[in-house]
Amino acid sequence: MKKNKITAVLGPTNTGKTFLAIETMLSFDSGMIGFPLRLLAREVYDKIIAKVNPNKVALITGEEKIIPSRAKYYLCTVESMPIDKRLEFVGIDEIQMCSDQERGHVFTDRLLNIRGEKLTMLMGSHTMKNIILKLDEDTEFINKERFSKLSYVGHKKISRIDRKTAIIAFSAEEVYAIAELIRRQKGGAAIVMGSLSPKTRNAQVSLYQSGDVDFLVATDAIGMGINMDLDNVYFSSLKKFDGRKLRKLNLSEIGQIAG
């Protein structure tokens, strides 16, 4: 495989990695970014078509396919990236997902086998640095620092939470139960889960972002780069079922979700 220029942009969440990838892609004549979530791919697609002729922008996920005949820029879930496209720029977001038990093989395949003709950008956490170095390619590392500081504020009852707050739960049943409790006590909450249809998810995000409701209840998937205007993030539990067992969240997972 031809050696390729790689830029690895590493840092915690909320450090502008995705923004940098978008701006870099748009500086090339063609490009593609693979995201970990359908909702994030859609969010970036909506932002880009506000800047670029929509006829030049494609969205490809497991649920949505908008592919203009003259598309130059592709926003995809990692699984849906068209690997046969010859594009100047390729970006892969949340590259640390290579270690994920369920989806890691897909991220690893993209890490090893998909390249931009002029630049490949890998965005993710510092835990990936040694692995990226082992690719033995022409690699530049950019370290990103968090824009905002996370601080622990302790426990709070739902009746006492402030507006612009998200509560993270780890099952659909719990998400709906918490949202119903907030509706009774606070007047309403938006819900964001990967299992919702694209139309419903987008409507729920808009409901919160427009200020129609002041609270958000979501699964931990919201930590994968989805940008929401939040002041506080609470966890309904610090344990989650990882597909094999119920276990405690580690500090990096807490930072990823809350950040």
Residue ranges, per PLM feature:
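Walker B catalytic acidic pair
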Residues: 78, 93-95, 237
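Post-DEXD/H (motif II) to motif III coupling segment of the RecA-like Helicase ATP-binding lobe
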Residues: 31, 96-151
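Walker A/P-loop
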Residues: 2-20, 133-135
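Conserved RecA-like helicase motor-core motifs
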Residues: 52-63, 142, 185-198
